Amino acid sequence: YFLLANKVKKKNTNQEIKYLFKGHDLFFNSNHLYRNACDLWLNLIPNMMKKKIHYTENEMNNTEKKLEPIFIFGLPRSGTTLVETIISSGKIKVPNTGEASIIHNSLINLTNKKEIKENKDNILINFKILNETINYNYYELEALKNYTGTKFIDRTMVNFFFYEIIFKIFPNTKIIHCNRNYFHNLVAIYKQCLENLPWTHSIENIIKYIKLFDETISKIKLLHPKNILTVDLKELTNEPEKTSKLIMNFCDLEWSDDVLNFHTKKDLICSTASNIQIRNKIYKYDDNKFEKYKKYFSKYILKHNLLKI
């Protein structure tokens, strides 16, 4: 159905939407575990991270080198891969850990070992063990083995849920918030079959995830205004040199022409739906591309006030 939708998208938008709906419905209902995954990321994790976090054994480890990660926070199809590629294409080689899920996986592991305890209102974490575990797991990644620097990139999509823990462990964290018109983002996500993201197969679930993301970004901007930079996809594609200079300056990295010539690199690796786009030069953002979809999503726009989030 997704192939059929792609085939008719230029001539018959109505039929494209019908194919997309059938494709998403069929895929989502093909595995009962997808419902559990949706509940995890739309309800359980957000509710857990709203609780007050307390730390025991709150001393820092004695590692000589303090990592200064650059976390890229963004929804699918919001330019995260483009920003990641720009940063890693500069003169100074910044290791790229992709979507390694170190934070989330470490938290699961420590929860299973009873090093993280949770009740109705609070979370109790053994900070010393958490800190050592997360640092160790990062250094075990191939990209950071034998690395002598302090900066690296992590683009794991769900990291935004854990921003409090991230700042506790890495106080010098830099966050690049990739922003896109939320309606455009909704349509762009729905037009894809993102197999590893079960919440993307329902318009209502996509909107719920967008709201969770938006609320969290607002909190980070309030609590850590100097540690977060918002990069709008439209601005990045319309003024790539100006915006890429802002990105590199925020990351304390030197800008060069190489930053915008990433598509010529032979060692460019990407495992996301943006694989094809980043192998081409940056094209200007097309505002009119999604206008024809408004009538099909109008009830969701009105219900959730999506255009004003």
Language model segments and positions:
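Short beta-strand segments
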Residues: 72-74, 152-156, 176-179, 230-235, ...
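Aromatic-acidic/polar surface patches that form glycan- and anion
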Residues: 76, 152-159, 206, 236, ...
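Conserved nucleotide-binding/hydrolysis micro-motifs of P-loop NTPases
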Residues: 101-102, 180-185, 236-237
